[in-house]
């Protein structure tokens, strides 16, 4: 092969290689999008792995309320059955020890202890806040006086559910909207501490929720 032709072929191959590399670089956004999708997938699995599942039987149905995500999820064991993507809670946020009149939603593990099917909020599933653990914590920290704590324990022992007249308040639960606008809970938090979903959603939950069911609020 003549030397001049060899030089031309070499230059051509170098040009093709350079063009190919440039072409790959021009597709960088596509590569980035694949990476982003992968990162999103990893993030999703990380979030699922981060869920702290309570000690429940595989067939036990329970409720998990994620205030940060504003989501109510129904689980059977560790399997998610359904998710309600929007909810409203207390106008003043949330706290483990929720005080009477604070408009905060309590955080913790609770049990449904009553159902009101004549509620002005369409349906009301009450939870056992304040629990004995929270009441004891409040007493130790000075929020409840000795007399308040004695009243709490006596009332719960007599009635099987916590009182609502101590400084910790009560009457907390999951309910619908009643006669309020259907999209209210998507606009702002408006409750005095309860968890609110739409009337349609609370009626859908009725087939699952029952007295004794675990409700985890985080």
Regions found by a protein language model. Name each.
Residues 2-218:
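N-terminal pre-domains immediately preceding structured catalytic cores
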